[in-house]
Structure formats: C-alpha cells, structure tokens
C-alpha cells in the first residue's frame, strides 16, 4: 500500500468534530496542510540532519500525520517507533511506516518502551501544548528512553525575545489558545533549553526560524505549488473552514514579532562524563 492510499484510508483525528471546536493543527490538516511545524519543513530537516539518524534506533513522540516519520526513514535509521496518543493518528502513521517501522498508541509521558532503547528521540510541536509539569514529564521520559550519548531533538514554538514582557506573553498565549482551541504554552528559547537541561541533557544545537506557518511563501515552500493550490481550493469551498483558518492566520500575523520556531538537539551524557 502506498503512503498516499494509506493516508486516505485512515480518518483524520477530530474529523467528526465541528470545525470551530477542533484543535487548530487538525483543522489545518483538514484543509490539506501536511507540514504543521512552527518553523517549517526546512527547520525540521536541519534538525534531523544534526540528530544522527543513520543506523540509529529512533523514537518519535506525537508523529501526527506522519510527515516527519517519512523524513526520518529517509535518514536510514536501524528502527523507527512512533508514540502517538490519538488512536486515529497512530493508525495512520502505522500504515505509512508499515514494513519499515511501527507506531504504538501511547502517552508520551508513559510510553511503555524499554529504558535505553533509543539513540534518537524526536518530538515536534507537542511540548508547546503542555503545562510546565507535563513538559517536564515528557522530557524526562525522552531522557529515560535514550542510551548514553543519545540525542533528543525537538521543534517547538518559542516566545521572543528571551526577556519578553510577561504581559505580552500572557496576551499572546491567551490569543493563541482562542485561535487554535488548545491551551498552548510556548516558552522562550532560554526556557526551552532549561527544560532539557533540567532532565540532565546537554544542549548541542539551537536553530530558529520565523513562525510563518500560514504565510503564502511558507505554505508554498512547505507544501509545494500543488499542495498550496489544494489548500486554497479546500478553503474556497468551505466557508467555516476558511473562517477558522483566517482567524488563526490573523493571530499569527498579529504576534509574529514575538513568536519563532525553535529546533534544539540535546545529548544525554555518557556515564563517564
């Protein structure tokens, strides 16, 4: 079964929920958007190139549509395991990676996987959606899964600058939560690094990119001309979907100076370090 037919045969998560009630990332997926990361495909690919995928045992938290899973497989890992809490998304990713990997339906805080089973753990646009307590639990689980010397690679939404006024940060978080129907809790780049360091990880690389998820240029760069045209067509024929996406776009535009996509690769120290 091809990747395309696999995707088509599996429903999107929240596909039965009204468009005004569904989480924003799944609304964008309903519109036809496949790359749902704040810094775009280029930032993800740069992050993966620094994670050391070749010959590695890789675990991905919250693979969602499975786009990054495909890119990980291109890197030649020894194994791939997705950990996805949503059963529909887990089934979708399982079909996409069939014969080359697997996807388990589990919580990233408690994966059920063996300690020290991974050389690389990847997670994108999922820590942002959690409270600081849950962020810490997920990062700790990633650290548990990693072998000494293993890498944890994350791509998340960051507040900017590091000394952002707290009132601005609060307004941004509230506006973002209203727009995407998820209680998003982005952190500054400095705070993201501190989340990783608190679990004993050592930050090796930090990369950033504009948070331009719905800008025309980014859409074409991430989805291609054909993909951008597909999204435009879907929005043109569904007014509720169009209204919801435009609300998100206005919010992203309003706060664009205070948001970034950030990718960080951190290493679990070896026992003799």
Model-derived features: positions:
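Conserved catalytic/acceptor-binding region of the Class I
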Residues: 149-211
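A short acidic, Gly/Pro-enriched loop at the edge of an enzyme's catalytic core
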Residues: 109-121
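A short glycine-rich, Lys/Arg-flanked "PGG" loop and its adjoining helix->strand segment in the class I
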Residues: 136-151
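Class I SAM-dependent methyltransferase SAM/SAH-binding core
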Residues: 65-111
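Conserved Class I S-adenosyl-L-methionine
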Residues: 205-273
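Class I SAM-dependent methyltransferase Rossmann-like catalytic core
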Residues: 22-41
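Conserved class I S-adenosyl-L-methionine
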Residues: 55-64
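Conserved alpha-helix/loop element of class I SAM-dependent methyltransferases that forms part
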Residues: 37-54
